Amino acid sequence: MGCIKSKRKDNLNDDGVDMKTQPVRNTDRTIYVRDPTSNKQQRPVPESQLLPGQRFQAKDPEEQGDIVVALYPYDGIHPDDLSFKKGEKMKVLEEHGEWWKAKSLSSKREGFIPSNYVAKVNTLETEEWFFKDITRKDAERQLLAPGNSAGAFLIRESETLKGSFSLSVRDYDPMHGDVIKHYKIRSLDNGGYYISPRITFPCISDMIKHYQKQSDGLCRRLEKACISPKPQKPWDKDAWEIPRESIKLVKKLGAGQFGEVWMGYYNNSTKVAVKTLKPGTMSAQAFLEEANLMKTLQHDKLVRLYAVVTKEEPIYIITEFMAKGSLLDFLKSDEGSKVLLPKLIDFSAQIAEGMAYIERKNYIHRDLRAANVLVSESLMCKIADFGLARVIEDNEYTAREGAKFPIKWTAPEAINFGCFTIKSDVWSFGILLYEIVTYGKIPYPGRTNADVMTALSQGYRMPRMENCPDELYDIMKMCWKESAEERPTFDYLQSVLDDFYTATEGQYQQQP
């Protein structure tokens, strides 16, 4: 296609720290230490050391692997749910996606349980410091989130070497502020573990207890486990087209050209966001066809579509609730206006990650902008409203020159010829970067839509903003290439933004 491409830099060097003297690459908030043994082939990890729970398929009643313990309490909502207390043990009878049928070992009652509220007994998943299925970058985001401080830590599975683990620790550096340091946990042939070869441990739990007593060569002593918010329970089994009366609208969060957004509750129990569409915005049939595609797109950086109400107007779209609202509103708020550039870059990287997933799925957003990105309590960004623009039937929108069409965010080929592709989304992402770095200002300030269309046809591009680094502006200009095929991929954009602050000069961390 002629697009700029780049492979993600997922190598062992970026994943951990060895306790020997070795060169370090500094970032603004993170320190990565090269692993001098990364070019050596590691011995296969024995099955007994694989991440517990990964092969949880067999349902032999005699197997200990069927026993799970509750990480959080759960009050059942439906008659066939099984309520339980934190610490209660249950035997899994059947797995049904995100809901499992189980039997309490204490009460002997049976029912359905949310699978993300439990963990297999005698595994790392029962430990509050173990974060399953988390990337290195998201581990850094979690540790830097409000509520954590220096000494906060977590254990995660290595992204690059299945069955291996890494320790991530929040530290404070006078020159760089809060930083995250990653330590690779190595395995012994006999099943033990170590970070420094000076001292080994029979299990990871013993290792954690040791480093909670003294730093012993780590950047600092381990203190509290990284805060882990209680997960939202999985959506109800087979609840897609739901009754309107099952939704209670509680608080109006905002209003747009095509409807309103509310905080509400489903069945008086699950907090959700509800988008109510103005009558005539789109046909129920066209929306349902698109929604059936949208609900298959599931990623940490995409807002989860739960259910719909389409039997009569207004159409309701039920999604996961994001506490901080839209990125646009957040950037304009008192809290958002105090966010520093490194976090703004991180917002951009998170959005690029979500769009890279959409890119891999051969899908198109069509309306990517700060108003359609939502922010969580822990400042995680998720992309919303992907695909909806395709089924809007409003004449002022479909005309493309109409007042409701987002001209300033749209690529020239999409404005002029209706040619929407993932590359037109890349153009929009460049405009979104402008919104982020200006804390929510409208692009092309002082220009009308007509002025913008004329200027773009003559090669005009927005100039660099005063507080925008040259390197970030270079990324914007790449997104605004006239030829769609010359624009970068979202995979490339994610890799560049993830490593935006990576220094090129190596430093050294001394062996303890």
UniProtKB/Swiss-Prot annotation:
Location(s), subcellular: Cell membrane; Nucleus; Cytoplasm; Cytoplasm, Perinuclear region
Single GO cellular component term: mitochondrial crista
Sequence positions bearing Phosphoserine: 228
Membrane topology label: Lipid-anchor
Name of this protein: Tyrosine-protein kinase Lyn
Residue positions bearing lipid (S-palmitoyl cysteine): 3
E.C. no: 2.7.10.2
Organism: Rattus norvegicus
Xref: Pfam families: PK_Tyr_Ser-Thr, SH2, SH3_1
List of residues that carry Phosphotyrosine: 193, 306, 316, 397, 460, 473, 508
Domain SH3: 63-123
Keyword Nucleotide-binding attached: yes
GN (gene name): Lyn
Reaction(s) catalysed (UniProt annotation): L-tyrosyl-[protein] + ATP = O-phospho-L-tyrosyl-[protein] + ADP + H(+)
Tissue specificity annotation: Detected in spleen (at protein level). Expressed predominantly in B-lymphoid and myeloid cells.
The entry's keywords: Adaptive immunity, ATP-binding, Cell membrane, Cytoplasm, Golgi apparatus, Immunity, Inflammatory response, Innate immunity, Kinase, Lipoprotein, Membrane, Myristate, Nucleotide-binding, Nucleus, Palmitate, Phosphoprotein, Proto-oncogene, SH2 domain, SH3 domain, Transferase, Tyrosine-protein kinase, Ubl conjugation
Region entry Disordered, spans: 1-50
GO biological process assignments: adaptive immune response; autophagy; B cell homeostasis; B cell receptor signaling pathway; C-X-C chemokine receptor CXCR4 signaling pathway; cell morphogenesis; cell surface receptor protein tyrosine kinase signaling pathway; cellular response to heat
